[in-house]
Amino acid sequence: MTRFVLFISCFFVIGMVVECKDGYLVGNDGCKYNCLTRPGHYCANECSRVKGKDGYCYAWMACYCYSMPDWVKTWSRSTNRCGRGK
């Protein structure tokens, strides 16, 4: 029983350490990656480039990625600086 509890505890600790995030990819200008005129596989390729698991073009406007590492910058409304200069 002790081994089982230890195993479950380790499982939760590993789950907390290996967290990934989902979100819109952001370019150097602070704007989301535009995919309106790109081929269908563009977003999946861009997400793979930053070590994401998968991605797609959300509503034909911006690339949305799944399971990216924490170091990848993603767009959020609170930190949006797209179109505001540098």
UniProtKB/Swiss-Prot annotation:
UniProt modified residues of type Arginine amide: R84
Keyword list, A-Z: Amidation, Disulfide bond, Ion channel impairing toxin, Neurotoxin, Secreted, Signal, Toxin, Voltage-gated sodium channel impairing toxin
UniProt keyword Disulfide bond, yes or no: yes
Domain LCN-type CS-alpha/beta positions: 21-83
Tissue specificity statement from the Swiss-Prot or TrEMBL entry: Expressed by the venom gland.
Keyword tRNA processing carried by entry: no
Stated family: Belongs to the long (4 C-C) scorpion toxin superfamily. Sodium channel inhibitor family. Beta subfamily.
Domain notes: Has the structural arrangement of an alpha-helix connected to antiparallel beta-sheets by disulfide bonds (CS-alpha/beta).
Name of the protein: Toxin To3
